[in-house]
């Protein structure tokens, strides 16, 4: 399955209709369905969730995103010795540390750098790739697709995280997954995908 977010809306491409409600299910017919969904999501005050069903999801996905410029990014879900995970609060939503890859960086290098910059935690050790997420946003005069490589990282020190305020990060807090599930403030859909990926392991 392939999934892309635009604000709180998402479009997914898969081989069978989902069991969840509140999703509009359509057959994949044309690459322009990506733009149609974006326009619907922009004009609606509520999240718009589309599922495009096809026997060939990889081919359909490549056609849907072919016209979009892609920016590569990387980030991390950090786990401490107590089994808690580090989340940051930025722009009125809970998020995870991440950022664009610099030229010449590998995704792993970028993920470590971004987490260290945004939380001041070091040393960090990558224990594995969790997932990739996609989201679309308006950049200057066009829509852009950001692909983020997410890694599970371990931190065994006792230093408290320090939020990078220049990046609008207000808080950085350790939580177990039960505490995370009880959060009252909004959480980015991509972050929920990352958390689901670690609970599925």
Model region roles, listed by residue range:
Residues 1-42:
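N-terminal leader/capping segments at the start of a protein or of a new domain
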Residues 78-79, 152:
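Conserved hydrophobic "DFG−1" position in protein kinase catalytic cores
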Residues 31-75:
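Acidic, metal-coordinating catalytic segment for phosphate/diphosphate chemistry
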Residues 1, 73, 146-150:
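Short hydrophobic/aromatic beta-strand or adjacent loop that forms the aromatic wall/cage
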Residues 18-28, 79-116, 121:
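Conserved Nudix-box catalytic region and its N-terminal flanking loop in Nudix hydrolases
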Residues 190-201:
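Charged phosphate-binding loop/patch that engages nucleotide di/tri-phosphates or the phosphate backbone
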Residues 101-190:
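Unchanged
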Residues 75, 84, 171:
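Conserved beta-strand and immediately adjacent loop positions that scaffold enzyme active sites
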């Amino acid at each position: 399955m392939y999934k892309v977010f635009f604000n709180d809306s998402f479009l997914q491409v898969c081989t069978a209709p989902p069991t969840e409600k509140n999703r509009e299910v359509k057959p994949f017919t044309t690459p322009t369905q990506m733009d149609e969904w974006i326009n619907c999501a922009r004009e609606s005050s509520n999240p718009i969730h589309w599922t495009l069903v096809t026997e060939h999801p990889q081919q359909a996905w490549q056609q849907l995103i072919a016209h979009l410029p892609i920016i590569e990014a990387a980030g991390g879900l950090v786990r401490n010795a107590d089994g808690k995970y580090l989340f940051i609060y930025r722009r009125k939503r809970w998020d995870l540390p991440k950022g664009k890859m610099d030229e010449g960086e590998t995704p792993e290098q970028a993920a470590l750098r971004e987490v260290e910059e945004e939380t001041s935690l070091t040393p960090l050790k990558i224990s594995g790739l969790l997932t990739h997420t996609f989201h679309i946003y308006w950049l200057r005069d066009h829509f852009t697709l950001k692909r983020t490589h997410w890694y599970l990282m371990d931190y065994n020190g006792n230093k408290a995280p320090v939020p990078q305020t220049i990046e609008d990060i207000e808080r950085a807090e350790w939580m177990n997954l039960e505490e995370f599930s009880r959060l009252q403030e909004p959480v980015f859909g991509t972050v929920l995908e990352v958390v689901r990926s670690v609970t599925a392991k």
